[in-house]
């Protein structure tokens, strides 16, 4: 049963309840040595699933619809999240930015692979279906389905970290490849990583990242859509921070881990049949190599990613201020300066999102894309602040991060609660319950296993650090910006030589130079 068939009304996207039901499809998910029967009820996934369901419910909230939704452009007469429709102007992109931000605030910026992330893939299908050649109609059909239903896609485009120095066709026992072609579709086998939150998605887009060595065997040159319930398709999940939080603590102890854990997984495909209508690129290395930029996704997803990070930094900035109120150090000049630096990082990413929209450029078929220079700047800068901000928090909050009882249960023990009330209270009249609550939230954000995973996530979000810098350089060269910068330096160099100024408006110094006299 297709996910869209769970809708009671075909003129709207899924509701939260319908989304959860659509995940109960027998998908093959493994964690802790066992197969998961139902991701919507399993303690490793259920709160993350409920958090995604909250996003879908927001699309039907009358108070949020003006910010979140537009009418579809597919002829259905329905409505959808704004980022699921192709932008046709700079103002469209600005409205999409605001819709992305509104959705992201529901998870305080802590869920990055929400349905709007891969809506950028759907937008590329709709704006430039001709890129896919013989599979153009497939692109059009998927754009329609993704938009009208709000389908939740993820992608798995990175090969496992095994022999990455070799071309894909030399690691044929690991990397995803064509096994055979049939009338019904193609049969594929192999593995991809890192399938973040795929356990809670409807489909995975399988393809190539931009920096991978592809080789010459066209059996590896594939891009297709794989249903999460396809026979032979399995996910092997990493440890669940949500489950650990539930087993060892409470929401008071782990308020982020216990609901926003987007579980990463190894995606394994064992002779999976991919119907022809799900194929987008087939045995075509040239198109695979060109897809990153020409397919549109790489020009669209940075808007969602930048806004999501900006929302997250809003949260972290305010949480740092609240933590400093707990410790009584907020009035210290040096501490205020540190907080000011965090505010500056936050401001930068919001400013980049403004620039992406305000300087948007026309693309193909009337579509508009975020400004290329701004999005490439975001990709280079995004890994930088997180470790820096974490270090600022550690320096300014200091022992407050660990001067905490083990659990909310300690507050329910009358033998120690009075002691905690005296010695673990906050500053300026803040009681111990509030102080502990705030600082446990901060610890979950930066010090827990969940927090550590997010640091790794932000550092590597856009892929190879070298590659994103090279792409930023190539953009400067291809846009003409590098030529303009070089021309400015050349103009400066041309205004003087070893004999003095070469431009008429400046005075040479022969009348005041003292060197001849001094050297006699």
UniProtKB/Swiss-Prot annotation:
Reaction catalysed? 4-hydroxyphenylacetate + FADH2 + O2 = 3,4-dihydroxyphenylacetate + FAD + H2O + H(+)
Instruction: Give a Pfam family name.
Output: HpaB_N
Q: What class of enzyme is it?
A: oxidoreductase
Pathway assignment: Aromatic compound metabolism; 4-hydroxyphenylacetate degradation; pyruvate and succinate semialdehyde from 4-hydroxyphenylacetate: step 1/7
Induction is noted as: By 3- or 4-hydroxyphenylacetic acid.
- Which residues, if any, are the signal sequence? none
- Which keywords appear in this protein's UniProt record, sorted alphabetically? Aromatic hydrocarbons catabolism, FAD, Flavoprotein, Monooxygenase, Oxidoreductase
Tell me one GO molecular function of this protein.
Answer: oxidoreductase activity, acting on the CH-CH group of donors
Q: What is its EC number?
A: 1.14.14.9
Q: Name one GO biological process term.
A: phenylacetate catabolic process
Q: Origin, by domain of life?
A: Bacteria
PANTHER family per UniProt: 4-HYDROXYPHENYLACETATE 3-MONOOXYGENASE-RELATED
Q: What subunit structure does UniProt give?
A: 4-HPA 3-monooxygenase consists of a reductase component HpaC and an oxygenase component HpaB.
Similarity comment: family membership: Belongs to the FADH(2)-utilizing monooxygenase family.
The entry's function note states: Utilizes FADH(2) supplied by HpaC or by another flavin reductase, to catalyze the hydroxylation of 4-hydroxyphenylacetic acid, leading to the production of 3,4-DHPA.
This protein's name: 4-hydroxyphenylacetate 3-monooxygenase oxygenase component
- State the organism named in the record: Klebsiella oxytoca
